[in-house]
Design a protein with these regions (language model features):
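Flexible phosphate-sensing "switch/lid" loops adjacent to ATP/NTP-binding sites
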Residues: 2, 6-157, 161-167, 172-285, ...
Length: 310
């Protein structure tokens, strides 16, 4: 939930504009048959369906595919790298919430979240990534408390005083903001952000408030099956519905919970189009968010200095 994926998308677009062929390699999410998943390549939405991706995997892969960037994942990360090297000039390691890069990189960009000040020095592997970084992106400065931004900046500098620090906003985009105004809404956020990410809300909640929803309805009375179990395990989740989908049963429970909810519409802050995998009986507005650097240097400045135009 810090903004790693949107940062990777921004980096990939810059590198492509510079003339480079780019692929993203995601850290492992081994939910299925690990033998079949030795090397996975995703270039189309059909690839996601054929390889039986979970919602969590789709949340990471779909935005890259939307931008025309090939995604690799799987189990054998040397074999994955060797295949990616055959078709691209630059590999982007897209991960970090559960690990640090499996590859020795030429440039390490680490995202810090001022909505969770202190996590950058108190959590593993975040603290390790801080020490390895060449560049920090302090994201969401447009919605964080100024004192928290300062605290994160000071913490990063104390652990890694030579790294460059970029501040960035995370502006929200909704297809029809007026559709939200005055409505009773169900807010959905990506599951990992709310659960092991420890966030109480995400982009969907911010958009619902910003665009004038009359009420954010508590989804818990409408929850079924595994969604009930998720709320018990992560009670801080509160009035937001986590888009849990680690298997077919969970996806069905998510669909039933959404369709049970007595609301006017759904505001979805997940990075994917949920309607591709579930049938929803009420209107849905997707919230999109991109990285917007503030001031200089920008990521483009740093990437051009490091790699130059092809």
């Amino acid at each position: 939930g810090s903004g790693k994926s949107q940062t990777t998308r921004r980096v990939s677009l810059i590198l492509r504009d510079m003339g480079y062929r780019v692929a993203a390699i995601r850290h492992p999410m081994p939910y299925g048959n690990l033998v079949k998943q030795k090397v996975q390549r995703f270039a189309t939405y059909d690839d996601l369906t054929k390889q039986e991706c979970t919602i969590e995997e789709r949340e990471e892969y779909e935005p890259h595919i939307d931008n025309g960037v090939i995604v690799y994942a799987g189990v054998d990360y040397e074999a994955i790298l060797r295949q990616a090297e055959q078709e691209v000039d630059i590999v982007l390691w897209d991960g970090g919430n559960n690990d640090f890069s499996f590859y020795v990189s030429d440039l390490s960009i680490v995202v810090a979240d001022p909505h969770r000040p202190g996590h950058e020095v108190s959590f593993h592997p975040g603290e390790t990534n801080v020490r390895l970084a060449d560049v920090f992106v302090i994201n969401k400065v447009d919605t964080a408390l100024p004192e928290n931004v300062i605290s994160v900046r000071d913490n990063l500098h104390s652990l890694n005083p030579t790294a460059t620090i970029i501040e960035a906003a995370s502006p929200l985009f909704v297809d029809d903001p007026e559709a939200i105004r005055g409505k009773r809404v169900l807010v959905i956020e990506d599951g990992p952000t709310l659960t092991h990410g420890g966030m109480a809300y995400g982009a969907g909640w911010v958009a619902a408030r910003r665009f004038g929803a009359a009420e954010i309805v508590d989804p818990r009375p409408f929850a079924v099956g595994s969604i009930i179990d998720t709320y018990r395990k992560y009670p801080k989740t509160g009035t937001i519905l986590p888009a849990m989908g680690y298997g077919d049963e969970m996806v069905k429970d998510l669909e039933k919970t959404i369709n049970n909810a007595k609301v006017d519409m759904v505001v979805s802050g997940t990075p994917i189009d949920l309607t591709r995998i579930i049938k929803v009986n009420k209107p849905m507005q997707r919230v999109r968010y991109e990285l917007q650097e503030i001031g200089k240097p920008t990521l483009e400045d740093i990437l051009k200095q490091k790699f130059g135009k092809k």
